[in-house]
């Protein structure tokens, strides 16, 4: 079987230019020195780095932990406030009138720029409104808003008074919303009359009403932001529902709210993520360690400079939006672009228009978006300038080498380093990444660990793989890091069982990885996405990377399905680029490519031409659904309303039924 790294990387190393290195926030030499210190003397390293934040009171101990039993405390006894670190610290400096949030609406004619002082003023006022409705330190506030500035203002206002925010992505169904309300038991809900996505209205207030009707929890207060202005279809309950703008315009409302002094280990937010059991997990993050992780990674990974305009395309409903649209940028005094729309509206040049409109210097997006835009060709890109860009980033899933090369050549014009970042909702901040002026990149590799992070590969018996050279295993983290989650909200047992029980003494990420001869890490996909073919473990990401090497293929998703002889067979869903005709010749080409790049053991048993893939609105492929369809199970697919395009599922089922007949 050929070296499987051939699938994940073209054999080349891309080093930063001399100019980029000269001006970078860190050199390779300094990275190695600081990384060594962060592992060998974490107390000294993190005590020094924690001074990046403003503390009302210093901690009594940097770190205490019983890691194998999932018990970790950072900066215990230290007092700070997140909104103070994101806003107050800047308004007595020249940053007061610097753009903090640059908002671009779904409709290209709509935009707003809020300075640090603007955001500070709005956050203080809304914090006082929350207090007026009885929200106290430790209470939960559920936030179900579109990507508008009021979303950032709301979560910062929660942090100001010590309330725990739980943002639910605006694309989730009333049922999904209800399950989160039942779990976190919020004192108050903040929503909007509706929103816009791709030129189409989306229901928000109506979904909240439906969720509250079915919920066991009796939420007494719903604050509604006016976004669409369409009140005709709204159901309004006096004494429960209140307009945001009406409350904010109250002349008696105080313009200042004293920030609550929070212990470093006080809860900051709950963010729900999918669990293997189907019930969403409320990932709980705390104040000090999380903010330090977001702050420090943002500074080094994105090589941020005072004059930069930075754009993370993620929705705040996901952890990437929390850490790298709000908390990381604002605690560093950066200008952060916030985008309500989608990359394809009003046309496939929208991302590039926004970059040119605001002179974006740093652009952070997902491989799914990159591949979708690759499919549209170069016409939209050639009409744009894009010369303001100096750094590109990728997040959410491994980026296949073809997409990496396209991104580097066509968007970065061959001059912008790409930081391919690996991390999770649970980790809070970036864990494995290139530092752009220090670490040479390899297309498809997340590269090396960030400070304080000890990634290890563990075999199925729980033994750490220490061999030099190229090895594969289960990706685990050895030892605590500041921004790690502290628990599953309301379910401490589940926290230990999910992350610490499988490999004793390690945090198990759920991902498989390969470490090459240079120590670079290559994420090979979820371990539950590994297909066991005749006793051979085949990573779905490896087969997918081989399939998308073909110039006709836009995207591929590979899952296992029951096979009478092999135990599991390989089922490949393949989406082709526009204008490409699907036929047996192309099918044979794809099978041949997989055989050539991995081996005959990895050849797909089925190639299913797919009009699209079922994805969440954040771009995550729902492999659970694909596995069921591949196995001929068309019932019990779960709530598909959260998908970006639910109709894709029905089309895939119809195609599969034709195969059977």
Swiss-Prot record:
Family to which this protein belongs: Belongs to the ATP-dependent AMP-binding enzyme family.
Function: Catalyzes the conversion of acetate into acetyl-CoA (AcCoA), an essential intermediate at the junction of anabolic and catabolic pathways. AcsA undergoes a two-step reaction. In the first half reaction, AcsA combines acetate with ATP to form acetyl-adenylate (AcAMP) intermediate. In the second half reaction, it can then transfer the acetyl group from AcAMP to the sulfhydryl group of CoA, forming the product AcCoA.
Amino-acid positions noted as binding Mg(2+) in the UniProt annotation, renumbered to this chain: 548, 553
Record PTM text: Acetylated. Deacetylation by the SIR2-homolog deacetylase activates the enzyme.
Xref: PANTHER family: ACETYL-COENZYME A SYNTHETASE, ACETYL-COENZYME A SYNTHETASE 1
Keyword Acetylation among record annotations: yes
GO MF, any single term: acetate-CoA ligase activity
Organism field: Leptospira interrogans serogroup Icterohaemorrhagiae serovar copenhageni (strain Fiocruz L1-130)
Cofactor (UniProt): Mg(2+)
Signal peptide: none
Positions annotated to bind CoA: 197-200, 320, 534
Keyword tags: Acetylation, ATP-binding, Ligase, Magnesium, Metal-binding, Nucleotide-binding
Pfam families: ACAS_N, AMP-binding, AMP-binding_C
Record protein name field: Acetyl-coenzyme A synthetase
GO biological process: acetyl-CoA biosynthetic process from acetate
């Amino acid at each position: 079987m050929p070296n499987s790294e051939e699938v994940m990387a073209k054999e080349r190393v891309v080093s930063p230019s001399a100019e980029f290195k000269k001006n970078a926030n860190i050199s390779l030499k300094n990275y190695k020195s600081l990384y060594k210190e962060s592992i060998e003397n974490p107390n000294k390293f993190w005590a020094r780095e924690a001074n990046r934040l403003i503390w009302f009171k210093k901690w009594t101990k940097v770190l205490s932990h019983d890691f194998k039993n999932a018990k970790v405390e950072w900066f215990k006894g230290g007092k700070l406030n997140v909104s103070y670190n994101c806003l107050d610290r800047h308004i007595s400096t020249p940053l007061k009138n610097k753009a903090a949030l640059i908002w671009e609406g779904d409709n290209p004619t709509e935009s707003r720029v809020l300075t640090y002082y603007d955001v500070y003023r709005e956050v203080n006022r809304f914090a006082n409104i929350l207090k007026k409705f009885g929200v106290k330190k430790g209470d939960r506030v559920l936030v179900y808003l579109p990507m508008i500035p009021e979303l950032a203002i709301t979560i910062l206002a929660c942090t100001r008074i010590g309330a725990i925010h739980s943002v639910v992505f605006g694309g989730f169904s009333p049922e999904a919303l209800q399950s989160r309300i039942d779990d976190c038991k919020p004192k108050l809900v903040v929503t909007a009359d509706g929103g816009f996505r791709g030129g189409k209205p989306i229901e928000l207030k109506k979904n909240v009403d439906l969720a509250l009707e079915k919920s066991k929890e009796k939420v007494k207060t719903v604050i509604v932001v006016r976004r669409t202005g369409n009140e005709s279809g709204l159901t309004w309950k006096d004494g429960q529902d209140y307009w945001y703008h009406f409350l904010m315009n109250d002349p008696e409302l105080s313009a200042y709210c004293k920030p609550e002094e929070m212990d470093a280990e006080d809860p900051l937010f709950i963010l729900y993520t999918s669990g293997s059991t189907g019930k969403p997990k409320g990932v709980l993050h705390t104040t000090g360690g999380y903010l330090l992780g977001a702050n420090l990674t943002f500074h080094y990974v994105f090589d941020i400079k005072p004059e930069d305009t930075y754009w993370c395309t993620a929705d705040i409903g996901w952890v990437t939006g929390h850490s790298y649209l709000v908390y990381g940028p604002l605690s560093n005094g950066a200008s952060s672009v916030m985008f309500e729309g989608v990359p394809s509206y009003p046309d496939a040049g929208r991302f590039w228009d926004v970059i040119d409109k605001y002179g974006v210097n740093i652009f952070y997006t997902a491989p799914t978006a990159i591949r979708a835009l690759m499919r549209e060709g170069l016409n939209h890109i050639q009409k744009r300038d894009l010369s303001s860009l100096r750094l590109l980033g990728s997040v959410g899933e491994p980026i296949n080498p073809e997409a990496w090369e396209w991104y580097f050549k066509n968007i970065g014009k061959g001059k912008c380093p790409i930081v391919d970042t690996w991390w999770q909702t649970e980790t809070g901040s970036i864990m494995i990444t290139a530092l752009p002026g220090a670490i040479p990149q390899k297309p498809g590799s997340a590269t090396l660990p960030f400070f304080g992070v000890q990634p290890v590969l563990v075999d199925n018996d729980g033994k750490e793989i220490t061999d030099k050279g190229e090895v594969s295993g289960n990706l685990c983290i050895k030892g605590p890091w500041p921004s790690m989650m502290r628990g599953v909200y309301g379910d401490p047992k589940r926290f230990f069982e999910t992350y610490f029980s499988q490999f004793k003494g390690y945090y198990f990420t759920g991902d498989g990885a390969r470490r090459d001869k240079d120590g670079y890490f290559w994420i090979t996909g979820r371990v539950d996405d590994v297909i066991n073919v005749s006793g051979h473990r085949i990573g779905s990401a490896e087969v997918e990377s081989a399939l998308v090497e073909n110039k006709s293929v836009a995207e591929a998703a590979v899952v296992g399905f029951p096979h009478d002889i092999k135990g599991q067979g390989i089922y490949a869903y393949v989406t082709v680029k526009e204008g490409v005709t699907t036929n047996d010749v192309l099918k044979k080409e794809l099978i041949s490519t997989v055989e050539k790049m991995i081996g005959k053991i990895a050849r797909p048993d089925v190639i299913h031409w797919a009009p699209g893939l079922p994805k969440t609105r954040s771009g995550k492929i729902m492999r659970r659904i694909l596995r069921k369809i591949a196995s001929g199970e068309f019932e019990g697919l779960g709530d598909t309303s959260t998908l970006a395009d639910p109709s894709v599922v029905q089309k895939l089922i119809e195609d599969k039924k034709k195969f059977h007949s």
